[in-house]
Amino acid sequence: MDDKAFTKDLDQWVEQLNECKQLNENQVRTLCEKAKEILTKESNVQEVRCPVTVCGDVHGQFHDLMELFRIGGKSPDTNYLFMGDYVDRGYYSVETVTLLVALKVRYPERITILRGNHESRQITQVYGFYDECLRKYGNANVWKYFTDLFDYLPLTALVDGQIFCLHGGLSPSIDTLDHIRALDRLQEVPHEGPMCDLLWSDPDDRGGWGISPRGAGYTFGQDISETFNHANGLTLVSRAHQLVMEGYNWCHDRNVVTIFSAPNYCYRCGNQAAIMELDDTLKYSFLQFDPAPRRGEPHVTRRTPDYFL
């Protein structure tokens, strides 16, 4: 298929997905193959230019992603950087991740999608995405196309050399961004080690490194954040991965910010969501938003475990 015809198809797919209508299995396969070609050229520390709007977890809450685009501006008019966790827990993981990947393929320079800890084969089999694919497609092929694609997602991004963005947090195995650039990311998220830590770690009030209650990654204190930022010429670590009630939360004396973009998480947490706009001088402002009005929410009983909020 020539590029022009494919672009036309893509535009039609994006339009369809904007109405929360899933693509068919063959279309998903084609989309994921195209996405791999684009993502394979991206770095483990993907360079991003400002202005850009930085977003946290979305977790299959499709209507809230639509609200995010209403508040922050449509793609490609606004540049976006998403810090992972597109699937699981929400009712529309399929439509959510398909739309974000379609936008990436259509506007590769305008949207950056990083890997979260839920972009993994193992986690999606427990927290909903696998079951949703089975329910919506009658087999696991679409789940396989996406989880194979997840191995290609960049692990981190660097906005204008100063703001370091990633899903989880820092790692005792990593002192410099060059250490991250040297990792082999084309694999399932390991159970331990630097790649695991980047997607699983959390900042903590206690200094130094600590054991994470999540069972993967570490907790890291302000001393660690300050040392890392100073050593790498950074002004800020921007990350997601944790529910914060206001949608964003500063910690470590403003060395770290957490951004969470799924309002009323799991349809029951009552939190606001937020996104962080970085203008062309890297000045930041936060936009908070509440859940989109729900029409005819499917009645799905909670079958996924409560752990790992």
Swiss-Prot record:
Chain positions found as Leucine methyl ester: 309
Binding site for Mn(2+) 2: 85, 117, 167, 241
Keyword Transmembrane: no
GO biological process assignments: mitotic cell cycle
EC number per UniProt: 3.1.3.16
PTM characteristics: Reversibly methyl esterified on Leu-309 by leucine carboxyl methyltransferase 1 (LCMT1) and protein phosphatase methylesterase 1 (PPME1). Carboxyl methylation influences the affinity of the catalytic subunit for the different regulatory subunits, thereby modulating the PP2A holoenzyme's substrate specificity, enzyme activity and cellular localization.
Residues annotated as catalytic: 118 (proton donor)
GO CC annotation: chromosome, centromeric region; cytoplasm; cytosol; FAR/SIN/STRIPAK complex; nucleus; spindle pole
Entry's family note: Belongs to the PPP phosphatase family. PP-1 subfamily.
Protein name as catalogued: Serine/threonine-protein phosphatase 2A catalytic subunit beta isoform
Organism: Bos taurus
Lineage per the UniProt record: Eukaryota, Metazoa, Chordata, Craniata, Vertebrata
Gene name for this UniProt entry: PPP2CB
